[in-house]
């Protein structure tokens, strides 16, 4: 696994796990804002642009990041955040290692498995993968994701560099992710975020996570869509993160 690193090695460590189909630039602005006060590490998830291997499973990605933390930071870091697929990987890490971090920010992580979505992914992407690499189609898709315009070039370039197989595998993995019983043993302070305008499945996932993690805090973000918090509202996101860790 490849990593982008910002900040000073002597500072507390924050790890940012990007969303599926994106890459390290998902958190670029956040990392730039925080680098004077923390060491920021952004793993490039397997199968994504800039990675060094194909995507296999959410568990494999979680295992690799846990090993990285063990090797470099003594088994625990200050805070880990994750968006969507990155949020699922974070939940998997917390399920395996209850004290992998002191604080966690989980944004829009689906935990309601859907066999229908799983079944549809392969035939749909089999037919439209060629379109995804067309700039006009990519612009339409980008607008539907409601990301801020300045991220389009990164999005288009990285979407074109992803293989069809990697897209299919990570989407299928994400569609079937579910809460592990061991997640309830987690001792990290967990903050859950979901946009008010997200799908019913995503809103239900956030509430189910909140029920499972009795001491967690659930934030339903007014007017926001999927990924809007970390990608489109950097100032608010950084303010929230700093407020969480200020008592460290």
Regions found by a protein language model. Name each.
Residues 95, 101-131:
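Flexible "cap/lid" loop of the alpha/beta hydrolase fold
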Residues 186, 192-194:
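Short beta-strand/loop motif that positions the catalytic acidic residue
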Residues 41-81:
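Active-site loop/oxyanion-hole signature of alpha/beta-hydrolase fold enzymes
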